[in-house]
């Protein structure tokens, strides 16, 4: 392993992305303890005068829980309806728990056309800057209720892994921390191979890495390892850094920022 020292003293603005699999228990119930830990960590970072943006999946998972559905509906309209119910519940819970730490949050729902159209991009960028200047944590998700994925009018990002990388770029963030249900990027699938080795540092996306990144997302989410690798490429392309790490204990974010070798660091040499 390459034990390259990690130093994040330059980091002033962070995007944290949490996936559905980190927010929803295997039973389908919401992991309230996880959300509380995440709120504590983000509030702690805000108190250190860092800017923090949270990209949160979970609207579908919350919606399935509230509506007592055991699986994602097949029809797109029903998927969007369930997500719209879940988004309200998710933001309500975030607002309630962050308030325990005297931290205010806001909601920003994005579609791809907003980011690709210069005037709306400028508006949303100004909104991010204003919220952060007011010491408010923007909580970002794709606007699932209205996003479409058709050839003549594509408004979907694909998944929130890609969305988080784009948000890191448009907000000039120094670091993207991607929380997942795995410890980082391995040389092969750790759920199949016991001898899989964690890659502590990745300086470029190689063909070997692309080959080892197959597989789909969880039953509650959409993002598999390939989507994380593609997001890392966006991060490389805009000269930023990314940590892919396990979201089981959000307090590990603080340890990672202190330089501990947690997860996989994607950073150019």
Swiss-Prot record:
GO terms for molecular function: ATP binding; glutamate 5-kinase activity. Keywords: Amino-acid biosynthesis, ATP-binding, Cytoplasm, Kinase, Nucleotide-binding, Proline biosynthesis, Transferase. InterPro entries: AceGlu_kinase-like_sf (IPR036393), Asp/Glu/Uridylate_kinase (IPR001048), G5K_ProB (IPR041739), Glu/AcGlu_kinase (IPR001057), Glu_5kinase (IPR011529), Glu_5kinase/COase_Synthase (IPR005715), Glutamate_5-kinase_CS (IPR019797). It is found in: Cytoplasm. It catalyses: L-glutamate + ATP = L-glutamyl 5-phosphate + ADP. Its EC number is 2.7.2.11. The lineage of its organism: Bacteria, Bacillati, Bacillota, Bacilli, Lactobacillales. The keyword Kinase applies. CDD domains: AAK_G5K_ProB (cd04242). It holds the Pfam family AA_kinase. It comes from Streptococcus mutans serotype c (strain ATCC 700610 / UA159). Catalyzes the transfer of a phosphate group to glutamate to form L-glutamate 5-phosphate. This is Glutamate 5-kinase. Its main location: cytoplasm. It is an enzyme of class 2 (transferase). The keyword NADP does not apply. Substrate binds at residues 57, 144, 160.
């Amino acid at each position: 392993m390459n034990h390259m020292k990690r130093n994040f003293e330059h980091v002033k603005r962070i995007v944290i992305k949490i996936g559905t699999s980190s927010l929803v228990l295997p039973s389908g119930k919401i992991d309230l303890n996880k959300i509380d830990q995440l709120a504590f960590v983000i509030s702690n970072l805000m108190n250190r005068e860092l800017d923090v943006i949270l990209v949160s999946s979970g609207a579908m998972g919350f919606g399935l829980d509230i509506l007592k559905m055991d699986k994602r509906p097949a029809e797109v309209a029903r998927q969007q309806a369930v997500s719209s119910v879940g988004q309200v519940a998710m933001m309500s819970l975030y607002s309630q728990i962050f308030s325990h730490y005297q931290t205010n949050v806001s909601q920003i729902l994005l579609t791809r056309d907003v980011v690709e159209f210069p005037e709306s991009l400028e508006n949303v960028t100004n909104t991010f800057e204003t919220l952060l200047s007011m010491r408010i944590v923007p909580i970002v998700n794709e606007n699932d209720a209205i996003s479409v994925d058709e050839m003549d009018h594509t408004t979907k990002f694909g998944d929130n892994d890609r969305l988080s990388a784009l948000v890191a770029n448009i907000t000039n963030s120094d670091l993207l921390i991607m929380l997942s249900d795995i410890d980082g990027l391995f040389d092969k699938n750790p759920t199949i191979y016991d001898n899989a080795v964690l890659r502590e540092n990745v300086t470029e996306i190689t063909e070997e890495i692309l080959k080892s990144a197959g597989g789909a997302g969880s039953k509650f989410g959409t993002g598999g390892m390939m989507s994380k690798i593609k997001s890392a490429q966006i991060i490389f392309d805009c000269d930023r850094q990314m940590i892919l790490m396990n979201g089981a204990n959000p307090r590990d974010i603080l340890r990672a920022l202190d330089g501990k070798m947690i997860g996989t660091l994607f950073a150019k040499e």
